[in-house]
Amino acid sequence: MKQYLQLLEDILQNGVYKDDRTGTGTLSVFGRQLRFDLREGFPLLTTKKLHIRSIIHELLWFLSGDTNIRYLKENGVTIWDEWADEKGDLGPVYGAQWRSWRGADGRTIDQISEVIEQIKTNPNSRRLLVSAWNVAELDHMKLPPCHYAFQFYVENGTLSCMWQQRSVDTFLGLPFNIASYALLTYMVAQQCDLQPKELIFTGGDVHLYMNHIEQAKLQLTREPRPLPKLIIKRKPASIFEYRFEDFEIVDYDPHPHIKADVSV
């Protein structure tokens, strides 16, 4: 995961100060890419400990199509609390767009089901893409999608994934995003009888919040450790039937957690 640390260094050295929506301020760079070979291990950051439970439950929540944080709260996940309304609703965010995109003709589109079917039946398609950036519904979302689209690529029995992100909280958010899209790639690969190969991140406004600068510098003093492995214990009938206990991360030996505040 040295490429992640190199990105932190890049922002610290080349970032420009920008005011932002939260009032915190950022150091920002524009247009960056990271690549992870999934055959070398599961890309879970080792220079600080990540909350694996939150990563897995959030992805299962996205895939369920749910947009209320009740499920997350029941499973000890608090990462969406700051944006939900008093009933726990977030509006038509990721889960709604992935599973029930509302078209102009009134029909709903399950993008996840469709992309998996296309991978199975038309793997050379250049349309293996899911988008959460539904312009007509952005104003109804408590937080418009930061990671707004992802695309799959099939070659020689392997599956790669590239996701696009308009806004990147590099210290807190990006490590979660990397692990989440890696997990999604493993799951889709298993459902399609493929092997996971590569994960690619493409970011637009890639930034460090000003109240994360010292934490980033601390992280840069730490040496990356060997990547853990992901074990998926069973293959359910569909991607929507995975359970939390189906996943096991082994040989994860991270440096201690580094506390940092979320900018809302």
From Swiss-Prot:
One of its GO terms (cellular component) is cytosol. InterPro entries: Thymidate_synth/dCMP_Mease, Thymidate_synth/dCMP_Mease_dom, Thymidate_synth/dCMP_Mease_sf, Thymidylate_synthase, Thymidylate_synthase_AS. The active site is at C146. The gene is thyA. (6R)-5,10-methylene-5,6,7,8-tetrahydrofolate binds at H51, D169, S263. One of its GO terms (biological process) is methylation. It comes from Anoxybacillus flavithermus (strain DSM 21510 / WK1). It catalyses: dUMP + (6R)-5,10-methylene-5,6,7,8-tetrahydrofolate = 7,8-dihydrofolate + dTMP. DUMP binds at R21, R126, R127, R166, S167, V168, D169, N177, H207, L208, Y209. The keyword Cytoplasm applies. The keyword rRNA-binding does not apply. GO terms for molecular function: thymidylate synthase activity. It comes from the Bacteria. HAMAP family: Thymidy_synth_bact. CDD domains: TS_Pyrimidine_HMase. Its main location: cytoplasm. Pathway: Pyrimidine metabolism; dTTP biosynthesis. Belongs to the thymidylate synthase family. Bacterial-type ThyA subfamily. Keywords: Cytoplasm, Methyltransferase, Nucleotide biosynthesis, Transferase. Homodimer. This is Thymidylate synthase.
